[in-house]
Amino acid sequence: MENVYVGIDVSQRKCDASIKDRSHNELVEPIVFEPNMEGIDKLLKVVTEVCKRLKAEPIFGMESTGIYHLPIYAELTALDYTVKVYNPTQINAFSKKSLRKTQTDKIAARTIADALSYEGVPRER
């Protein structure tokens, strides 16, 4: 089964998510959601639709952001999704490989999704 890679840029008040395939194609417009249960449900609705259409399994990735990523991480792992938490230094180093130097929340989410797809399937659950 194929995978789709969901990169999430987490902050205190909002999150941006990018959903990409193995070829780094963005499958839907970036999703903006609040870091609460309603926001996570909004994200999962879109992810579920994409995965159903492509017959794929999602892999989620996010940076460790102190406490802000923890509720999203806890909910996704409780639902038995594969989730990779990156040290921000890893994502910073990965993003330096890009020619694009502008950094926005949407670009950060795309970078995390790309890092997931290059890395392959993480083993953490």
Feature map (PLM): residue ranges:
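Phosphate- and other anionic-substrate recognition elements at nucleic-acid/protein interfaces
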Residues: M1-R125
